[in-house]
Regions:
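Active-site acidic/histidine proton-transfer and metal-coordination neighborhood
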Residues: 20, 24-25, 65, 81-187, ...
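Alpha-helix-loop-beta-strand connector modules within alpha/beta enzyme cores
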Residues: 53-75, 137-153, 179-180, 251-258
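Histidine-acidic metal/acid-base catalytic patches
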Residues: 2-7, 15-32, 64, 170-336
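Active-site beta-loop-alpha junctions enriched in small/polar residues
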Residues: 9-13, 37-41, 75-78, 124-126, ...
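Surface-exposed, active-site-proximal loop segments in enzymatic domains
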Residues: 40-53, 77-101, 123-135, 233-244, ...
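N-terminal substrate-binding region of glycoside hydrolase catalytic domains
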Residues: 9-11, 25, 29-53, 74
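Short beta-strand segments at enzyme active-site cores
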Residues: 35-36, 70-75, 116-123, 155-160, ...
Length: 336
C-alpha cells in the first residue's frame, strides 16, 4: 500500500462556518472526508460537542447530499488543566472523574452518530512554568482511562502533538503512548505544531521517528518564521500567524513522506485492526491564522494548502484520491 486518504478540518474552509459552505468548499477541492470541529447548522457556530440531535440529523442529511463522510471527531478532549492551580492562563480545570463520565462520553457519542472510528484529542495543560516531563505519569494514567472508554465503544483516541501541553513533542507523546500501552490510543503527527516551538526540520523529523511506533494518522499544516531562534518554552497566540502550505515550511514534509511511503503498509495494518481502513492525512492549514482551539484558511487558502500537500505527495510517489467524473456519475446514479 502506498496510498493515503485526504481529509481536512472543514470549518477552516468557510468564512461563515455554515455547514453547506464547508461541504461545498471541500467537495469543490475534491475531498470526500472531513474532520468535524466547529459548524453552523442554522443556530449559530457550535463545537461538535454541543450539537443538538436535530443538528446532527441535518448534518447527516447534508453528508449524503455532498458526498462527505467524517474521518474524525475534532474534539477538544484533553485541552483542560491537568491540575487545579492558578498559573496565569485562562485554561479550565474539570475534575477528571466528571470529565471522563461526561465530556469523553459525549465525544464518543458524536463518533457513533457520524459513523467514524477516530477521536482527536490532547494531553492536558500542565501548570505554566513547570516541566512537562514531571507530569507524564499523571497524564498517562488519565489518557489510559480515556483510551479504555473509547475502546469499549470500538473507537480509537488520537493524541495530537501540540505546544503548551504535556505532549508537546514527539518524544513526550511517545513516552505517554508507551506508558498507556493500549492500541485504542494512537498519536497524531503535526509538524507545524513543533516548528512553532522552535524545532528545526531535522529535529521535527526526529520527532516523527519517535512517534512511528504509536502513530495513527497525520495532521497537515506547516510553519515558517525566520525570526525563530531556538526553543520556545511557551507559544502565544501572536505566533500563530506564520502557517504556510506543506510544501513551503520547515516541517520536513517531503523527507517525512519519503519515509512514510515505506511505512504505510505497517501503519495501515495497525489501523485496520482498529476498524479504520486507510491512513488519513488531515489538512488543518491555518494559512489565514491559527489559535488555541482552531484556525482559519478560507476556501481559497484551503485549496492552496490542499494543492501544496498534493505536490509533495506527487513528488514522493504517494497515491491519493480526489473526486473524479466517475465519482460524480456514481453520485448521480444514487440520487436518481
Amino acid at each position: 500500500m502506498s496510498s493515503v486518504i485526504l481529509s481536512g478540518f472543514a470549518d477552516e474552509s468557510a468564512f461563515s462556518k455554515k455547514a453547506n459552505e464547508q461541504f461545498a468548499a471541500l467537495a469543490a477541492i475534491g475531498l470526500q472526508h472531513y474532520s468535524i470541529r466547529f459548524v453552523d447548522v442554522g443556530n449559530g457556530i457550535k463545537n461538535v460537542m454541543v450539537l443538538e440531535p436535530s443538528e446532527i440529523e441535518t448534518l447527516q442529511k447534508l453528508h449524503k447530499e455532498y458526498g462527505m463522510s467524517v474521518s474524525s471527531i475534532g474534539s477538544p478532549i484533553g485541552k483542560v488543566k491537568l491540575l487545579d492551580v492558578e498559573d496565569g492562563t485562562a485554561n479550565k480545570f474539570i475534575p477528571f472523574e466528571k470529565y471522563l463520565a461526561e465530556d469523553v462520553q459525549i465525544a464518543c457519542d458524536r463518533a457513533e452518530a457520524f459513523d467514524c472510528k477516530l477521536l482527536r484529542g490532547f494531553s492536558f495543560y500542565h501548570p505554566k512554568g513547570t516541566s512537562p516531563e514531571d507530569h507524564v505519569d499523571q497524564v498517562s494514567d488519565q489518557l489510559g482511562q480515556i483510551a479504555e472508554a473509547c475502546d469499549k465503544r470500538g473507537l480509537t483516541f488520537g493524541l495530537e502533538v501540540e505546544a503548551n501541553l504535556v505532549g508537546q513533542t514527539g518524544d513526550l507523546l511517545a513516552a505517554i503512548a508507551e506508558k498507556v500501552n493500549n492500541p485504542a490510543l494512537v498519536t497524531i503527527f503535526d509538524g507545524a505544531n513543533m516548528v512553532i516551538q522552535g524545532l528545526t526540520s531535522d529535529q521535527v523529523y526526529a520527532q516523527y521517528e519517535a512517534l512511528k511506533p504509536s502513530l495513527g494518522w497525520l495532521h497537515i499544516k506547516d510553519y515558517k518564521d525566520p525570526s525563530l531562534n531556538g526553543r520556545v518554552d511557551h507559544v502565544d497566540e501572536e505566533s500563530a500567524s506564520h502557517f504556510v502550505p506543506a510544501d513551503q515550511g520547515d516541517s520536513a514534509h517531503e523527507r517525512i513522506f519519503e519515509d512514510l511511503k515505506t511505512f504505510l503498509p505497517t501503519l495501515a495494518d495497525r489501523m485496520s485492526r482498529r476498524g479504520v481502513e486507510g491512513i488519513y492525512l488531515d489538512l488543518e492549514p491555518h494559512v489565514r491564522g491559527g489559535g488555541q482551539f482552531g484556525g482559519f484558511s478560507g476556501p481559497d487558502g484551503f485549496g492552496i494548502a490542499a494543492r501544496g500537500l498534493c505536490r509533495v505527495l506527487d513528488k514522493v510517489g504517494i497515491d491519493y484520491h480526489l473526486r473524479t467524473f466517475e465519482d460524480l456519475e456514481a453520485a448521480k446514479a444514487q440520487q436518481a
